[in-house]
Amino acid sequence: MDPVRLYYSYNDIHKMCAQQAEKILETFRPDVIIAIGGGGFIPARILRTFLKKKGSKNIPIQAIGLSLYEELVSDSPEEVPGLEVKRTQWLDFSTLGMVDLVGKNILIVDEVDDTRTTLHYALRELQRDVAEQAKKLNREGEKTTFGIFVVHNKVKPKNAQLDKEILDKYYFTGCNTPDCWIMYPWEAQDIEEHDSHVAKMGDLKP
């Protein structure tokens, strides 16, 4: 039996980002967005539009690449969870003009919180990097706060955990879903076919 699939359109994602941006501005106010590629890139860019305050500069977006999912060896476009997280791209703190993360509110963005393994890894490594930079710069007294935004959170047992403060205060999700395949428009090879599935689902999806 095929797994249940939930199809979401670009409009769906846009609206979820807009709704959550209000909550993020009320409680977190990020200085920097870090998008986990590739699923976090589009949500991060949409989110930045709604987080921009009038008269202020755009919030900078930095990118990291992590791989946990592996493509199935078949004609299917679906992916299955891998066994470990692998870095494919990371922040270079030595790069000229690199955004300073010490003492900032940093919002990590991804498309889905599935097993939570990727988010846990990203948060742990970024916390470690910021702590090292704070020590080098003699700024260990400055508090750096992390938040997380995901378009979807799958309601299921997780393989890893996040800091309690983040879960209680700074964890934002556009929608909670059951444990099923989530079909995003940026993964579609035929966007018209994808949108037809979205239309057929109507209000059935969360």
UniProtKB/Swiss-Prot annotation:
Q: What main location does UniProt list?
A: endoplasmic reticulum
Q: Which UniProt keywords apply?
A: Endoplasmic reticulum, Glycosyltransferase, Magnesium, Metal-binding, Nucleotide-binding, Purine salvage, Transferase
What name appears for this protein in its UniProt entry?
Answer: Hypoxanthine-guanine phosphoribosyltransferase
Location in the cell: Endoplasmic reticulum
Mind telling me which Pfam families this protein's record contains?
Pribosyltran
Can you name the source organism? Schizosaccharomyces pombe (strain 972 / ATCC 24843)
This protein's assembly is summarised as: Dimer.
Supply the SUPFAM superfamilies for this chain.
Answer: PRTase-like
